[in-house]
């Protein structure tokens, strides 16, 4: 992918992730763009990988769909072979390896969060294959606005309700300033009981 096309592709979206004591919250806007064209106003940018892992997606839609499908298949295969759910870190590492192997062809950035036997965790995986563990972070063109709020208001002892409210607030701040983000906020909460998604 040319640098010019990649620059246009990566100019939309705001996704947010944060970790609590026993949960992970993911949030994303709903606007899908192609350059400055609004291609869709009701896009789900949060996807379920397994019963205890979800991810946000940013970048080229087709690339993201292929990567998500691969991660789902690998998670199911792991569970079939071992009888256990794939650890969150393993899913993030696999995504990183795939993106590294196919760079610069695949243009995807993900936040991968979940709860497993090690507790809650959140990983950021970029299109170069870089993977980092985070307490809170954001991706996309609206991320500078979202991160500036998270820097000031995130606490490790947030309740689930407080964390959801903070994630929504962070995305909404980006919606107010970033033309590549818009149309409302979707939320996923991940606990040991599973994943709950809703539109707010």
From Swiss-Prot:
Residues that span the membrane, as ranges: none
Activity regulation comment: The formation of the proteasomal ATPase PAN-20S proteasome complex, via the docking of the C-termini of PAN into the intersubunit pockets in the alpha-rings, triggers opening of the gate for substrate entry. Interconversion between the open-gate and close-gate conformations leads to a dynamic regulation of the 20S proteasome proteolysis activity.
Cellular compartments per GO CC: cytoplasm; proteasome core complex, beta-subunit complex
Catalytic activity annotation: Cleavage of peptide bonds with very broad specificity
Gene3D superfamilies in UniProt: Glutamine Phosphoribosylpyrophosphate, subunit 1, domain 1
Keywords, comma-separated and alphabetical: Autocatalytic cleavage, Cytoplasm, Hydrolase, Protease, Proteasome, Threonine protease, Zymogen
Top EC group: hydrolase
Active-site residue list: 13 (nucleophile)
Propeptide residue intervals: 1-12
Subunit comment: The 20S proteasome core is composed of 14 alpha and 14 beta subunits that assemble into four stacked heptameric rings, resulting in a barrel-shaped structure. The two inner rings, each composed of seven catalytic beta subunits, are sandwiched by two outer rings, each composed of seven alpha subunits. The catalytic chamber with the active sites is on the inside of the barrel. Has a gated structure, the ends of the cylinder being occluded by the N-termini of the alpha-subunits. Is capped at one or both ends by the proteasome regulatory ATPase, PAN.
Task of the protein: Component of the proteasome core, a large protease complex with broad specificity involved in protein degradation.
Protein name, per record: Proteasome subunit beta 1
Protein species of origin: Thermofilum pendens (strain DSM 2475 / Hrk 5)
């Amino acid at each position: 992918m040319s640098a010019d096309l990649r620059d246009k592709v990566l100019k939309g979206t705001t996704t947010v992730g944060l970790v609590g004591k026993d949960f992970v919250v993911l949030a994303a806007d709903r606007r899908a763009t192609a350059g400055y064209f609004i291609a869709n106003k009701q896009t789900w940018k949060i996807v379920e990988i397994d019963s205890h892992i979800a991810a946000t997606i940013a970048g080229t839609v087709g690339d993201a769909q292929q990567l998500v499908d691969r991660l789902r298949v690998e998670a199911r295969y792991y569970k079939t072979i071992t009888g256990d759910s794939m650890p969150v870190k393993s899913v993030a590492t696999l995504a990183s390896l795939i993106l590294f192997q196919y760079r610069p062809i695949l243009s995807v950035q993900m936040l991968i969060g979940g709860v497993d036997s090690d507790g809650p965790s959140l990983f950021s995986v970029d299109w170069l294959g870089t993977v980092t563990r985070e307490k809170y972070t954001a991706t996309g063109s609206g991320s500078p606005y979202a991160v500036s709020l998270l820097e000031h208001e995130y606490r490790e002892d947030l309740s689930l309700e407080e964390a959801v409210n903070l994630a929504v607030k962070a995305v909404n701040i980006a919606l107010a300033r970033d033309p590549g983000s818009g149309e409302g906020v979707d939320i996923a909460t991940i606990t040991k009981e599973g994943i709950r998604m809703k539109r707010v």
